[in-house]
Amino acid sequence: MAKPNQRHACDRCHGQKLRCIHSGGGPCVRCAKAKATCSWSQSLRSNRLKRHNVPISDVPLACAQLATQSTDPNTPQFGAYMSQPSSAGVDIDINLLQTQFTDSTPWALPAGRYPSPASQEMETYNVGHTEADLPTTADWMWPAVANGPVQTTPPANWQQAFNQEWAMMASQHPVATMNTPSRTSPVSDAVDPPNTVCLLATIRELSELNVDLYAHEATVPRPPASLDEPISWKNKDFAIDRTFHLSQRLIEIVNKRYPRYLETARMQTPEGTPERTSESSPSGPPLDQGSCLLVLSCYTRLIETYDRIFANMQGCLDRSSVTAREDYVNMPSVQVGSFSLPHSSSLQIVLILQLARQLLTRMGEIIKAVQPEKGTNSADVTLSESATGGLLLSSALETVSAEEDRLMKRITKLRSTLIELNIL
């Protein structure tokens, strides 16, 4: 019987189903890089026909003569059976080939140290190759061999070596699977802008709103100063719906800085969770005193606009006068689907009062949440500057609060007058 054929790939590359690249009298590239023992075991392949065209010039002379002398169709070609030769002549030549291969690889360990099942054998591993076919590998590709000794103590068995190498490869090249979560941290699609840019956009929106409020306030007619002064609505038409629109703009702008006063945020707060108070920090950098005064300026202009509207209504009721048809103010229509509310004066007055009360209540809650930025470094802000800024803002808040209370009282009085006159 011929000696068992030694597989071309080392045990480590064979167990991982990788191509074994080696040259001369040294270990393969992967074993040298991992500082592992590079050993060869006998092949357990049996009766698997190899259909590879090997050049005759690359095969030893004895094998080439055997291939040319074989004329029997039942006789297999050289390389078809590497572990179980079919004739005595083949035994002699394969032994010569085995001896020549063994002499050229003195660093190969004895066969059988790492037994591998035949099911893990690849068909390309037993193809006959010579040293001329193997690529030459430079020492820089495996510095462990050039600079230091190779590990000589092999693991206990081939399965342990396979597990160690598999763990090493998994750590170097992690792969995300269905059961293994991805190692990469998720990246948010939404990129938060810098706080400075956010605050600058808020101040710009407040400034534009302040200009629009100033222009809109100029279109609302002033109420009569006394009962003796006649009242007329001619050439004094203005849009009440724009007043509501500007009020909503102020609510939305300030809500971006203080979202805890959104109605949706209140609805989403779970039961049993204490609601955040005005002392909690806003969703961005706090507004400075100048920005807080800008918010109060917008709110003051809205209060003045509403006060003019309701003062004109109160003047009409106090005089018990009947407005001519051509002097009617164009009120916005209210429509729900195909249903439209009638355009009666009483109904329009009720809608205006209710919408104004609701918007003013929401704006009042938001204004109470606006707090200036408090300096954390006492060295940067002197005591006089801090006292002056705090006094200015406190006075502005008190003034705006007084104007708000006066407007709410006017709305309540107007509603009571409409009820007494049986208009509502």
UniProtKB/Swiss-Prot annotation:
<keyword id="KW-0479">Metal-binding</keyword>
<dbReference type="InterPro" id="IPR036864">
    <property type="entry name" value="Zn2-C6_fun-type_DNA-bd_sf"/>
</dbReference>
<dbReference type="GO" id="GO:0009893">
    <property type="term" value="P:positive regulation of metabolic process"/>
</dbReference>
<protein>
    <recommendedName>
        <fullName>Isoflavipucine cluster transcription factor ATEG_00326</fullName>
    </recommendedName>
</protein>
<keyword id="KW-0805">Transcription regulation</keyword>
<dbReference type="GO" id="GO:0008270">
    <property type="term" value="F:zinc ion binding"/>
</dbReference>
<dbReference type="InterPro" id="IPR001138">
    <property type="entry name" value="Zn2Cys6_DnaBD"/>
</dbReference>
<dbReference type="InterPro" id="IPR050797">
    <property type="entry name" value="Carb_Metab_Trans_Reg"/>
</dbReference>
<feature type="region of interest" description="Disordered">
    <location>
        <begin position="265"/>
        <end position="286"/>
    </location>
</feature>
<keyword id="KW-0862">Zinc</keyword>
<keyword id="KW-0539">Nucleus</keyword>
<comment type="function">
    <text>Transcription factor that regulates the expression of the gene cluster that mediates the biosynthesis of isoflavipucine.</text>
</comment>
<dbReference type="GO" id="GO:0000981">
    <property type="term" value="F:DNA-binding transcription factor activity, RNA polymerase II-specific"/>
</dbReference>
<dbReference type="Pfam" id="PF00172">
    <property type="entry name" value="Zn_clus"/>
</dbReference>
<dbReference type="GO" id="GO:0005634">
    <property type="term" value="C:nucleus"/>
</dbReference>
<keyword id="KW-0238">DNA-binding</keyword>
<dbReference type="GO" id="GO:0003677">
    <property type="term" value="F:DNA binding"/>
</dbReference>
<keyword id="KW-0804">Transcription</keyword>
<feature type="DNA-binding region" description="Zn(2)-C6 fungal-type">
    <location>
        <begin position="10"/>
        <end position="38"/>
    </location>
</feature>
